[in-house]
């Protein structure tokens, strides 16, 4: 991989940077040759891998897959945001990839027969009820407003029958392994039980992108599944020590090298009765049985905690910044507002009252870095990153001239390893929201590189 950072060039009023070249040998021209910005559905060749992308957002999975290989061809995609009339993500997706084969409607209303058969189904199914910005106690898990979309994945796979895809690549928040608070690990157990009943072997790993040299500290649960009839499944079945698959032989360890954390392993069975799992899995226990890495086959779970093992180069927040001269004035913090930002970022202890019970309690929080460090990966981008109002969670940097400012949309895109101005056309506030919902495309690219070689 080529991590050399290219110099920025000026073209008219735009600042152009080639973030793709930081993570691979691909250039903008080469990306266009691979069809990343084509406006027609790609022609399918003999060795191509037909992809269906659900909950596509602005196309993070597609970008990662197509950077990994030109043979990943997305033939159908779906993106629908029920909470807004203006479908920003879908509009951006179509602008880059074309409207043909794209569905902008509630996936629950799309008949399975209208979704073409594919080799790989991918998607980051949204469970924002228990995202990083929400406390686990308030989480609805799969029962939550958006979490029920998991059942649309299950419905599509089940109704496809013998024509269901051989491979799955899925993404969710890291807390999925521990939710809900009242029944730790139940939601993830439901997912594994569902996929086991359909004949899939499932690998998972909680990955922090910054641990592998990427410029954002973003922890997410990634899953790769392969059907029992595949070559990968046959290789897994032959392995006597299944924990070797987690540490060395599987897709995840070959995409992201790791080592055992403490040598403590766990193995147990999950029922293929989804209702039984929903009602009784891990009931009454305080901790989830799932560790940050694992594999499940035939209802048998093997899991352990791993640590990243990486000695390559690291990108930092400072590496992805645009020149101060091209930052719009509204992104700079005025002297009169600076004190408000310092307060938000500082430590505090406050008395609060529960609106439901009237119970008074002390709420405290520690200080955060102010400004954000430029010599390390950024903090996690959240959906509330945009807007001028002071916030504890938004990024603030100090420029070379000594001024303080927020991050501009291009910088947020770079932190997720998207092409510059990928979300151009939406408001700055909305662009920040979209990047707060997106994944780090470099994670998908690395997984896809290994998956392609072992299919």
Task: Please describe what each predicted stretch is.
Residues 12-164, 173-188:
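Core alpha/beta nucleotide-donor-binding catalytic domains of modification enzymes
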Residues 2-29, 49, 293-455:
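C-terminal target-recognition/interaction regions appended to catalytic cores
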Residues 110, 130, 214, 395-397, ...:
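Short clusters of hydrophobic/aromatic residues that line enzyme substrate/ligand-binding pockets
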Residues 124, 167, 406-409:
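Short aromatic/basic micro-patch
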């Amino acid at each position: 991989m080529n991590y050399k950072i290219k110099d920025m060039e000026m073209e008219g009023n735009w600042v152009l940077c080639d973030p793709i070249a930081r993570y691979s040998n691909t250039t903008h021209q080469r990306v266009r040759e691979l069809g990343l910005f084509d406006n027609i559905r790609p022609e399918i060749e003999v060795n191509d891998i037909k992809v269906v992308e659900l909950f596509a957002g602005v196309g993070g999975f597609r970008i990662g897959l197509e950077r990994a290989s030109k043979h990943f061809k997305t033939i159908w995609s779906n993106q629908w945001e029920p909470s807004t009339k203006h479908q920003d993500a879908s509009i951006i997706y179509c602008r880059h990839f074309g409207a043909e084969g794209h569905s902008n409607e509630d996936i629950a209303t799309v008949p399975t027969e209208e979704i073409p058969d594919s080799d790989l189904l991918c998607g980051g199914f949204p469970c924002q009820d228990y995202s990083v910005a929400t406390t686990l106690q308030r989480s609805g898990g799969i029962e939550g407003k958006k979490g029920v979309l998991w059942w649309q994945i299950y419905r599509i796979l089940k109704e496809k029958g013998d024509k269901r895809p051989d491979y799955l690549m899925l993404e969710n928040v890291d807390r999925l392994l521990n939710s809900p608070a009242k029944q730790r690990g139940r939601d993830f157990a439901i997912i594994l039980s569902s996929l086991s009943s359909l004949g899939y072997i499932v690998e998972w790993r909680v990955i922090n992108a910054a641990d592998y040299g990427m410029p954002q500290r973003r922890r997410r649960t990634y899953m790769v599944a392969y059907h029992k009839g595949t070559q990968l499944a046959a290789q897994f079945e032959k392995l006597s020590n299944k924990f070797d698959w987690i540490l060395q032989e599987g897709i995840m360890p070959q995409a992201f090298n790791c080592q055992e954390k403490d040598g403590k392993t766990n193995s147990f069975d999950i029922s293929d009765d989804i209702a039984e799992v929903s009602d009784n899995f891990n009931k009454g226990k305080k901790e989830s049985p799932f560790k940050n890495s694992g594999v499940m086959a035939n209802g048998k779970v093997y899991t352990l905690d791993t640590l990243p093992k990486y000695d390559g180069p690291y990108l930092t927040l400072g590496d992805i910044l645009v020149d101060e001269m091209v930052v719009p004035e509204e992104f700079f913090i005025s002297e009169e507002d600076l004190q408000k930002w310092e307060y938000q970022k500082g430590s505090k202890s406050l008395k609060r009252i529960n609106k439901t019970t009237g119970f008074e309690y002390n709420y405290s929080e520690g200080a955060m870095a102010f400004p954000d460090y430029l010599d390390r990966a950024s903090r996690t981008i959240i959906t509330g990153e945009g807007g001028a109002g002071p916030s504890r969670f938004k990024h603030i940097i100090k420029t070379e001239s000594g001024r303080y400012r927020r991050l501009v949309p291009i910088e947020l895109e770079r932190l997720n390893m998207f092409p510059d101005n990928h979300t151009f056309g939406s408001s700055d506030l909305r662009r920040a929201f979209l990047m707060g919902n997106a994944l780090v495309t470099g994670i998908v690219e690395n997984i896809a590189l290994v998956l392609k070689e072992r299919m």
